[in-house]
């Protein structure tokens, strides 16, 4: 059946300002599904220096109207004239704030650059990982030289605003076992200042971090929902199934409860961290 073969399926009404380009059947998707290429953000994130690609992207709206972005594995460095990557580093996480607007100057990269002065020298526009895991073994000397931890690292979870500060979850990852790479083994709760404006020393300054917040192997908080009932609902997946937890209050540091099933399949909330099977 043709992609638009059913006359009952109507094309979505897309605002032209969104600058989306329809991708009909590009991936062989179900014909009722409409997929678009985001030309606006393709243009915004087309780079020649600095950050030029990353995964694990999260955004959080901030009270001042800015948007906080976090990335996991990223590329920082030089892009050649033919759009291929030149010399790039591979920080395992990075952060940025977007001020209102869709121009390059609206992207404020909160990165620790190795050097930005000499394009002919090593590590030009390369950066260090934003937040390191305390078990990472590289020496300070190697970190200052621009090397990146590969053994223990943090990957981003979601973030929320509480008491005019930003709370963010960072998932601890163990890469030391070649037979069990990217093993989740805990969560860090980090708190950032929102005092001032982008570019100020106080803005998005890391105020505190609890690297031992929990030892969860499930990534609760990969996605969050701040509900009107006063809880934050924390979502993750396990074996292609959804697992859910929630906070007691809007503070991520408050007591967590987990939505688990009993042997009869009835779900309820419990403060006891569940087994993977119970969480599913």
Q: Model regions: which residues?
A:
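Hydrophobic core register within WD40 beta-propeller blades
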Residues: 59, 159, 222-224
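Long, low-complexity, proline- and polar/charged-enriched segments
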Residues: 217-228
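Beta-rich catalytic cores
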Residues: 53-55, 153-155, 218-220
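Beta-rich carbohydrate-recognition and catalytic domains
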Residues: 3-52, 61-152, 161-214, 228-231, ...
């Amino acid at each position: 059946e043709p992609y638009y073969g059913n006359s009952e399926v109507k094309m979505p009404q897309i605002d032209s300002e969104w600058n989306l380009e329809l991708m009909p059947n590009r991936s062989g998707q179900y014909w009722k599904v409409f997929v678009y290429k985001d030309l606006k953000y393709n243009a915004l994130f087309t780079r020649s220096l600095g950050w030029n690609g990353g995964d694990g992207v999260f955004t959080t709206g901030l009270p001042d109207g800015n948007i906080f972005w976090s990335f996991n594995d990223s590329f920082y460095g030089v892009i050649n004239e033919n759009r291929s990557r030149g010399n790039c580093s591979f920080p395992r996480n990075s952060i940025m704030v977007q001020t209102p607007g869709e121009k390059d100057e609206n992207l404020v990269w909160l990165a620790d650059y190795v050097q930005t002065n000499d394009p002919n020298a090593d590590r030009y526009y390369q950066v260090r990982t934003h937040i390191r895991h305390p078990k990472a073994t590289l020496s300070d000397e190697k970190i200052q030289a621009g090397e990146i931890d590969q053994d223990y690292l943090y990957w981003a979870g979601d973030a929320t605003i509480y008491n005019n500060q930003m709370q963010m979850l960072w998932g601890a990852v163990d890469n030391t076992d070649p037979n069990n790479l990217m093993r989740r083994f805990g969560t860090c709760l980090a708190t950032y200042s929102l005092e001032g404006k982008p570019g100020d020393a106080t803005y998005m300054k890391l105020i505190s971090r609890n690297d031992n917040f929990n030892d969860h192997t499930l990534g609760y908080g990969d996605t969050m929902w701040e509900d009107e009932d006063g809880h934050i609902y924390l979502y993750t997946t396990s074996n292609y199934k959804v697992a859910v937890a929630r906070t007691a209050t809007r503070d991520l540091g408050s007591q967590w409860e987990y939505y688990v099933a009993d042997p009869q399949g009835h779900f309820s909330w419990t403060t006891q961290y569940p087994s993977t099977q119970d969480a599913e």
